UniProtKB/Swiss-Prot annotation:
Species in which this protein is naturally found: Xylella fastidiosa (strain Temecula1 / ATCC 700964)
Chain segments carrying region Disordered: 1-25
Protein family membership: Belongs to the universal ribosomal protein uS12 family.
Gene this protein is translated from: rpsL
UniProt keyword Nucleus present: no
3-methylthioaspartic acid PTM positions: 89
Protein name, UniProt field: Small ribosomal subunit protein uS12
Top-level taxonomic group: Bacteria
Length: 124
């Protein structure tokens, strides 16, 4: 425990907040252009080819973004919307692409959890 004299000389430091998605600059989403679309392999216990894109954002930052859902139509120079949210088994991937907005099409034939993949309500 610090003495009163010590606290007068140097007050207690409030813990600083560190963003999990700093490239968004406190915005909910950001627009960007795909510079490279490729697949990446996950960390040790898992095995897959995860679809990711390197995106240059409007604030000139380059980030790696995960493309969720089955199949996608993204290629180089596609304009995408990026939201925060990391992928646990892909190191360095701290952002997700928003499906169903700008150039990223929604997932076709998606029945459940449609809002997360930009899929329209099916005609029943």
């Amino acid at each position: 425990m610090a003495t009163i004299n010590q606290l007068v000389r140097k007050p207690r430091q409030a813990s600083t907040y560190k963003s999990a998605s700093p490239a968004l600059d406190k915005c909910p989403q950001r627009r960007g252009v795909c510079t490279r679309v490729y697949t990446s392999t996950p960390k040790k216990p898992n095995s897959a080819l995860r679809k990711v894109a390197k995106v240059r954002l409007t604030n000139q930052e380059e980030v790696i973004s995960y493309i969720g859902g089955e199949g996608h139509n993204l290629q180089e120079h596609s304009v995408v919307l990026i939201r925060g949210g990391r992928v646990k088994d892909l190191p360095g991937v701290r952002y997700h692409t928003v499906r169903g907005s700008l150039d990223a099409a929604g997932v076709a034939k998606r029945r459940q959890g449609r809002s997360k993949y930009g899929a329209k309500r099916p005609k029943s």
